[in-house]
Amino acid sequence: GTLEADLAVTNGVITALLDPPNDPADARGAHAAYLVDVTGLVVAPGFIDIHSHADFTLHGSPAAETVLSQGVTTLVGGNCGWSPFPHTGHGLLQRASSFMHPEVDWTAHDAGSFGRVLAADPPGVNVVLQVGHASLRLAVMGTTNRAPDATELAQLCALVEQAADEGVRGYTTGLTYAPCSYAALPEITAVAKVAAARGLTHATHMRDEGAGLLGAVDEALAIARRSGVRLQISHIKALGTA
C-alpha cells in the first residue's frame, strides 16, 4: 500500500518520515532549505532502466529529459551486443550501429575515453556501461562470418578485460543481429568466462524468440553454466501464433 507522510532528505539521504501536519505551513517546513509540495503524487526511488541503448545518444542529449520525466534516474547501456566501444576509428561500428541513429563522439575508442567524454558534459542521469559482443567482433574481426582463430579469440577476451578495467559492469550479446549472430557457443562461452572472472554480468538478446525459443533459452543457460557468468535474458518472450 501507500503511506501518506512528509519526507525529509538531507544530502541525498532520507533522514525522516513524518506524519503529515494538519497545517501545510507547519513550522518544520520553514527549516527546510528547499520545500517541494507533492500533495497527491507518489514519491518513489529513481527507476533503473536495465535495458537501454542511451549510450548511443547521451552525447547528443546529455540532459536526458525524456527518461527523467518518466522517473528513470539510472540507465544501463550497451545492450543487445551493441556498445559505442571498442572501435578502431575506421567508421565500421559507426555504420553498423546507424539503425540506432547514434549521437556519439566517435573520438572515444574505448570505455575509458567514452566515460571521460560523458564526464566532460555530465548527463542528467546515472549511467552504467556494458560492452557488447557485436562491437568487440567488429573491432577484432570486422564483418567476417566465421569463428575466430586463437589470436582473435584472445583479442576479444583482452578487450573485455580492458573494458572491465575501465569500469563497465556487464558483457552483452545480441544473437539475432550480425555480426554477433556469427558467434557460436564456444566463442561466447570463452568470452563470458573472462567476463565472469571480472565480475561482469551477461545480458543477452537471445538467438531466437519464435519457433526456436526453447533452444535459444538452452543456449543462454549453457553459456551461464559453462562460464560461471551471471545471466540476464533481456526480453524473454514468445513470438508467433500460439
Language model: regions and residue ranges:
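Di-metal (Zn2+ and/or Mg2+/Mn2+) metal-binding site signature of metallo-dependent hydrolases
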Residues: V42-T66
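Hydrophobic faces of well-ordered beta-strands that scaffold small-molecule active sites
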Residues: G46-S52, L75-G77, V127-V131, Y171-T173, ...
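Histidine/acidic residue-rich metal-binding segments in metalloenzymes
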Residues: S113, A119, A147-T173, P179-A242
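Acidic, glycine-rich active-site loops and adjacent beta-strand->loop/helix elements
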Residues: H53-F56, C80-S83, D208-G210, K237-L239
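Short low-complexity, flexible loop/linker segments enriched in glycine and/or proline
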Residues: V36, G89-L93, S98, E187-I188, ...
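Histidine-rich, glycine-flanked metal-binding segment
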Residues: G1-G46, S61
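Divalent metal-coordination and catalytic microenvironments
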Residues: G12, G40, H51, G71, ...
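Divalent-metal coordination cores built from histidine and acidic residues
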Residues: G60-R169
